[in-house]
């Protein structure tokens, strides 16, 4: 990241020691280290996001090529890219109503099972008491 050699680093340390003093220098070094790590983290995050966006853009371009050329004339790589893009589009376009309906069905079936279990326990307790 920075092209700083050993002697430049020693010079910066000595100047910092003279300017800040021995009490404040460790705190200043920690602050600078936090700033540098935050900057590296932000740079890596931006790099990863750009790589992801470029991949999506490449898949979209491959899909456009496929539509123009026709699906029969595609290379295996392009066919795989088209399938990946279609799967990604399907996963994004799923309606939320289906998911909520599945959740309601699961919760109602589990509550029915709970009521049946409680009824069985009650009838078993009544049978034992008689």
Swiss-Prot record:
Transport in keyword set: yes
Gene3D superfamilies recorded: 1.20.5.3310
A GO-annotated cellular component: TAT protein transport complex
Membrane topology: Single-pass membrane protein
Transmembrane segments: 1-21
Subunit structure: The Tat system comprises two distinct complexes: a TatABC complex, containing multiple copies of TatA, TatB and TatC subunits, and a separate TatA complex, containing only TatA subunits. Substrates initially bind to the TatABC complex, which probably triggers association of the separate TatA complex to form the active translocon.
Record-given protein name: Sec-independent protein translocase protein TatB
The organism's taxonomic lineage, starting at the top: Bacteria, Pseudomonadati, Pseudomonadota, Gammaproteobacteria, Vibrionales
């Amino acid at each position: 990241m920075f092209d700083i050699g050993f002697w430049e680093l020693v010079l910066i340390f000595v100047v910092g020691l003279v300017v800040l003093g021995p009490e404040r220098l460790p705190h200043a070094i920690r602050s600078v280290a936090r700033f540098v790590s935050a900057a590296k983290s932000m740079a890596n995050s931006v790099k990863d996001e750009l790589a992801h966006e470029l991949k999506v853009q490449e898949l979209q371009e491959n899909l456009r090529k496929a539509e123009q050329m026709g699906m029969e004339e595609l290379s295996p790589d392009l066919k795989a890219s088209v399938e990946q893009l279609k799967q990604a589009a399907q996963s994004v376009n799923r309606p939320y109503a289906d998911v909520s309906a599945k959740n309601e069905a699961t919760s109602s079936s589990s509550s029915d099972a709970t009521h049946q279990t409680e009824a069985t326990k009650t009838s078993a307790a009544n049978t034992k008491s008689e």
